[in-house]
Amino acid sequence: MILYLASGSPRRAELLQQIAVPFTVLPAPSIDETPRSAEAAVDYVRRMAREKALVGQARMPTPGAVLGADTAVVLGDQILGKPADDTEALAMLTQLSGTSHQVISAVCVCSEGRQAVRHTVTTVQFRPFEAARLEVYVATGEGRDKAGSYGIQGLGGALVESLSGSYSGVVGLPLEQTVELLEWADIPYWQID
């Protein structure tokens, strides 16, 4: 069965490649990513992953399974998405500096008229940083397309003091849950040519 990745994220593609899953990338789905009133962060992220997979399913050129995913950074009850600009990125990182926050990642697989969603919640502790140091990081541009304005797998790893949970979930695709869903949909991994 063909697996389609409904995402423009190079990090998600890299994580699927890491577990040797053959897949084809579909264009990133365009959906309304506005949280609903009183929607819990976990419910929001799961809904986004499901909606991305369903939009991807409608765009499949041939029958197969579609994987959609979403990640959000949550500080208290505030969902921090991708920054609109460097000013917003600096504001987000300033909020996160020296604090503990959650990174919620969800993955959905739609296959043969069925769908299943799994998620992870990872606690990330940031080191405290002065504004000048955060400005240097923002200027690298690394966090511009990332929830919470940082990339743990790159330069942003220096912002992190510790984490408890799924490292791959913080990157953008929780591999344990992804493998569970691939098995559920009978999609092989570890396909080394």
From Swiss-Prot:
Q: Name one Pfam family in it.
A: Maf
Q: Which reaction does it catalyse?
A: dTTP + H2O = dTMP + diphosphate + H(+); UTP + H2O = UMP + diphosphate + H(+)
Checking Gene3D superfamilies in the record gives: 3.90.950.10
UniProt keywords (A-Z) are: Cytoplasm, Hydrolase, Nucleotide metabolism
Give the EC number(s) listed in the UniProt record. 3.6.1.9
The family annotation for this protein states: Belongs to the Maf family. YhdE subfamily.
Q: Which NCBIfam families match?
A: maf
State what protein this is by name: dTTP/UTP pyrophosphatase
- Organism lineage string: Bacteria, Pseudomonadati, Pseudomonadota, Gammaproteobacteria, Oceanospirillales
